[in-house]
Amino acid sequence: SLVPKTIESPSLSNRGCHDFIQFNEGTTDNRLMPFEAISRAIRHALIFMARHQIPSQCDAKGDANLRLAIAQMLNHERGMHAKVEQIGMVASTQMALYAIAKTLIHTNDFVVFEQLSNPMARKAFANCGANILNISHDNQGIDIANLELLCVQYKIRAIYISPQHQLPTTISMSAKRRQELQALSERYQFFIIEDDCHDFNFSNQASLPMASQAKSNNTVYLASLSGILGHALNVSFIVAQAEYLDACAAQITLMDGQADQVSQMAITELLKNGEIKRHRDRSLKIYRERRALIAELLQAELTEFINFTLPESGLAIWLELSPSINMLRLQADAELEKVGFIPTNYYASSEHQVSAMRLGYAHLNEEEISLGIRRLKVAFMNQQGQLLRA
């Protein structure tokens, strides 16, 4: 295989080097955060809590006002019919995944993942005793025939998907595949765990989540505001039927018995006064420019080595590499050129290897993107025996 068998977590590699350009999974640029608005909202929350002697801990499901604001946002922007009692706040997406796994999964239950998928989600379910089954996928989404075959062979408990912007390939699942998946879920009675990455869409035709469908009682939906707010205020949320949400909340209490009331009150203010929407709109314009730049540079500088389709949503691009590229050597050469990327095997099941990489670009400014692509070009060309320096 051209792909190395092991890879250090991308979050640990050269992150401290100020001159090292790291293309990540697709996070936002923390330098664009509305720091004044955030600090003002936190100050308001602290003052309110002190004056009214409100405990620093809140309900296991989260602050009621925040849950109401989230419900209104989801129903207005994502076409859902969420009720406050169906929404639970969580400190992070990873904690949400683990709570869902602990709630839904019993030892040796079968859970389906795409062959290329979120590795941390895979680990969360495996840690809770799940047997992981891998399913193929293409440019329309999951292979429905493959899934139905698994349903015949095994008693499937759940499937994990990110249909809006598949991690890592960036593909959006087609409407037809979504309908077929919903039908299979109803027929074979398994849960759909929908991880919705919808914060930044560059088209006017963003698809609605599967949880917005009328028959979505078997869908557990999770999303996050951290994609918009970055690390300034980490918050994720789960939307599920009330009985499952109650069980998730019990698990969350065991993991994090001190839900951050200050942060949740601050986020509520930012949602209600429109600051989060304004920040998202401002950021989208900047990310659109960065998206156009990296697409232009990839076409101009790396077209002989890669193939890609520019996605309509998300903040990353999936690059399929030429068969002649040795991934292990490319990583080493890129490291020498002070540029990093996330290779396929970080996301791949053990039996599925593809020579590709994911380039998250939004956290980099235009100068950093340009420098990073130039350095990547050097790394690619070194495989041809050409020595260039960025």
Regions from the PLM with identified roles:
Residues 87, 190, 219, 306, ...:
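Short, conserved active-site loop motifs that form the nucleotide-linked donor/cofactor pocket
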Residues 47-188, 193, 200-214, 287, ...:
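Conserved core of the PLP fold type I
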Residues 347-351:
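AMP-binding (ANL) adenylation modules
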Residues 28, 163-166, 227:
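Short glycine-rich anion-binding loops that position phosphate/pyrophosphate groups of nucleotides
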Residues 206-225, 246-247, 357-358:
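Conserved active-site segment immediately N-terminal to the catalytic lysine
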Residues 1-43, 249, 253-259, 269, ...:
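N-terminal basic, amphipathic alpha-helical segments
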Residues 220-300, 308-309:
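PLP-dependent aminotransferase class I/II
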